[in-house]
């Protein structure tokens, strides 16, 4: 995992991943997330404490069986899909992410904005309520910013909406200068938003031997294929493991009373997806994934990811 804070002036790396390029990787990541001309955060005078350590020998022995690789940890992982959106993601989450993507483009092109921001979308009342917080320069024209953000929201929310922009009034200090960043703090945003249960732990900072990551991807893959093949309108997959064991302890499917086929047909379909860790890693090619892509806008709902592929079954 990584900890970033201006107050500490340091970046702490604590991962079970061996690499000789920690300094390069850290600076590359910070360059993409901080405008150095805007932020009071000096990338040229950065202290980086590399505390990479070898993985526990007991864990290594449990996960290095080529024939029947065991789970790298115990845990219960979930995957979800719905036919309510083109991305098969929950509607409010889909809206908030699309707003955030457009906001990200604006932040990168507008010298008065930095890259720290949040978007929240809630619905169910007379209006869809949208809260946007985005870091800005002291001299920004807030009326102009409100107009720009309102236009972004209107392009991504079909219903009547109410926008609350920077409800604290001012958001000048952000990023590591304003708050310590820690891998795994935002696991709900990394997944499906608050309408779907959270299972396991954080995805980032883990190689695919950790089922927190690989099984969560596999659960999404299975749920999406169940919905995409029109077996159900909504689907939640839960899969649990014990460390060192290959076979899942439990695999359950909840279609929320939207199942469109006989249960036996659903079971036959599910059986086509081997949920053992080694099989998941091979099927989704998880040792050859550029995981940097998944640090923005959730790990799910991106058509180019292997776990988003609709299989020809």
Predicted regions: what is each one?
Residues 81-101, 206-230:
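Alpha-helical support elements that line or immediately flank enzyme active sites
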Residues 37-38, 107, 156-157, 206-210, ...:
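Flexible helix-coil linker/hinge segments at domain or subdomain boundaries
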Residues 234-313:
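Internal helix-turn-beta structural module
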Residues 10-14, 129-136, 250-255:
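Short, hydrophobic beta-strand segments
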Residues 1-12:
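Single conserved hydrophobic/aromatic residue that forms the stacking wall/gate
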Residues 13-30, 80, 84-87, 214, ...:
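Glycine-rich and small/hydrophobic secondary-structure elements
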Residues 140-226:
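Glycine-rich anion/phosphate-binding loop at the beta-strand->alpha-helix junction
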Residues 24, 28-174, 296, 301, ...:
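Glycine-rich, mobile lid/loop segments that gate access to catalytic sites or pores
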């Amino acid at each position: 995992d990584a900890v970033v804070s201006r107050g500490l002036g340091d970046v702490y790396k604590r991962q079970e991943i061996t690499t000789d390029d920690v300094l390069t990787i850290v600076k590359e990541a910070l360059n993409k997330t901080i405008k150095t001309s805007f932020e009071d955060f000096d990338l040229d005078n950065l202290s980086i404490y590399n505390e990479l350590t070898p993985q526990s020998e007991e864990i290594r022995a449990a996960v290095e069986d080529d024939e029947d690789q065991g789970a790298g940890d115990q845990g219960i992982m979930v995957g979800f899909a719905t036919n309510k959106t083109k991305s098969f993601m929950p509607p409010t989450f889909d809206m908030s992410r699309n707003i955030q993507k457009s906001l990200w483009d604006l932040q990168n092109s507008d010298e008065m904005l930095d890259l720290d921001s949040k978007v929240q979308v809630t619905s169910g009342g007379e209006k869809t309520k949208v809260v946007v917080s985005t870091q800005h320069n002291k001299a920004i024209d807030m009326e102009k910013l409100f107009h720009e953000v309102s236009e972004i929201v209107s392009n991504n929310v079909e219903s009547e909406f109410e926008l609350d922009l920077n409800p604290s009034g001012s958001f000048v200090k952000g990023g590591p200068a304003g708050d310590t960043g820690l891998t795994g703090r935002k696991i709900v945003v990394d997944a499906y938003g608050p309408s779907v249960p959270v299972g396991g732990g954080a995805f980032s900072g883990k190689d695919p031997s950790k089922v927190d990551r690989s099984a969560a991807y596999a659960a999404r893959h299975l749920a999406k294929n169940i919905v995409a093949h029109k077996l159900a309108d909504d689907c939640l997959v839960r899969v649990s493991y014990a460390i060192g064991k290959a076979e899942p302890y439990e695999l359950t499917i909840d279609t929320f009373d939207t199942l469109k086929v006989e249960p036996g047909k659903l079971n036959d379909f599910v059986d086509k997806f081997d949920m053992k860790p080694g099989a998941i890693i091979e099927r989704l090619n998880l040792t050859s994934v550029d995981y940097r892509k998944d640090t923005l806008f959730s790990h799910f709902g991106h058509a180019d990811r292997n776990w988003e592929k609709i299989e020809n079954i």
